[in-house]
């Protein structure tokens, strides 16, 4: 079953359907990554720095030349925001991985970096990803989804 990363839903599914394979929904995972990264950007804005939003949220391959330059500046001058952006992009790569081994290697690298992060908000995010590691890795080539995220949410809430 594909679900968002809510512990209560995961526990309920495991209790009601113990044989069900729980998969962390990639859409919700990347949405959460974007939200966390944008919060790090807003923290910097509160200190008086103006950081553009789109270079951080867009897929790097889709950036305009100007946005790519803005992203390079952010990476150079705003370490915490750059760390959140790196994790977000690496998480995208987990879902783009062509093999389970590649996905696991990328996720392990994320977990290692998050564990030693200088930003206090990045450490608990890393712990959340670690708790959901198996469910995140369950969704990539070679795996399968049993239903759409919305359908699973309706069923698990019903």
Residue ranges and their predicted role:
Residues 24:
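Short loop/edge segments at beta-strand edges and connector loops
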Residues 34-45:
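Short, surface-exposed amphipathic charged segments that create phosphate/polyanion-binding patches used
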């Amino acid at each position: 079953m594909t679900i968002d990363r809510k512990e209560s839903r995961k526990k309920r599914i495991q209790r009601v359907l113990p044989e069900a394979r729980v998969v962390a929904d990639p859409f919700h995972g990347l949405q959460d990554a974007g939200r966390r990264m944008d919060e790090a950007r807003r923290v910097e804005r509160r200190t008086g720095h103006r950081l553009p939003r789109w270079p951080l949220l867009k897929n790097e391959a889709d950036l305009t030349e100007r946005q790519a330059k803005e992203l390079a500046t952010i990476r150079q001058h705003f370490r915490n925001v750059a760390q959140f952006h790196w994790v977000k992009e690496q998480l995208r790569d987990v879902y783009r991985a062509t093999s389970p081994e590649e996905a696991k290697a990328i996720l392990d690298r994320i977990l290692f970096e998050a564990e030693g992060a200088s930003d206090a908000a990045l450490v608990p995010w890393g712990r959340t990803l670690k708790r959901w590691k198996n469910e995140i890795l369950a969704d990539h080539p070679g795996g399968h989804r049993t239903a759409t995220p919305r359908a699973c949410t309706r069923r698990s809430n019903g």
